Amino acid sequence: MANPKKMRIEVVERTGPCFYEYKAGDKWDVTGLKTPEGGFCGAAYHTLFPVLFALNFGAKYPFMKDVDSLDTVVCPDGGYVRFKAKRME
């Protein structure tokens, strides 16, 4: 198994309601596949998990400006919050 990678989840934009009141610029650092500390929206994490999994094991997104990130992950509750997941190492 690969060493867990340091990654960052960031809110890129919010265009509507959000129960957790996330706003653009909010950031959480995670290591490997651990959930962010302090609680995190389960629906949003469920959507982010495949991206975090892929990044943790070395995936690259060649169609992104930064190949070590994906910034098109949207909240499944209406799509009002868009997240970016980035491998930091």
Briefly describe each language-model feature range.
Residues 1-9:
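Short, basic/aromatic beta-hairpin or loop at an interaction surface
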